[in-house]
Amino acid sequence: MKNQKSTLLLIIYCLSTCIVTAQQHVETIKNTFLNPKSNKVLVVAHRGNWRSAPENSTAAIDSAIAMKVDIVEIDIQKTKDGQLILMHDNTLDRTTTGKGEIKNWTLADIKKLKLKDKDGKVTNYVVPTLEESLLTAKGKIMVNLDKAYDIFDDVYAILEKTETQNQVIMKGGQPIETVKREFGSYLDKVLYMPVIDLGNK
């Protein structure tokens, strides 16, 4: 009995240590991101590591984490029934076994589809929700949200639910006055990164 208690305490200690270490890792990345004097180059995995798993999948996020990437960029779309999923395109055609616009599909129906890899081959992976993806990344990697600006009220509710506000980077290409007007209530809660188009002069 005494040995069992000791083992249980050891397991609890190890788990708590892992959680603290993971949180510290994210804070280190965040501090580097915010430090204008830092000479460290932060690595971003665009749509996750899509070379080893389908883009915008939890497997692609896991792979980026395993590679010790600093930030994973993911794209968000909204389903017919108002659920948030990971998908770059407005349609399902290119990256899944389905066809048509995402806005015409419910989450339940999308979950029946399979994701395709970079070569268009069908895999066993399914389309993840934003919540599933944030829980995969939680405490392990910073998350850059794309295509989230216009639906950020919905996005933020999930950030609160998953307690991942501290590791998310929101972005947009709008003028600063527009951002303050439309996004102002969130500017002290999440990081905001303006997209600068060097082609526009």
What are these regions (language model features)?
Residues 1-26:
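Bacterial Sec-dependent N-terminal signal peptides
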Residues 23-201:
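Phosphate-group recognition and catalysis centered on beta-loop-alpha active-site segments
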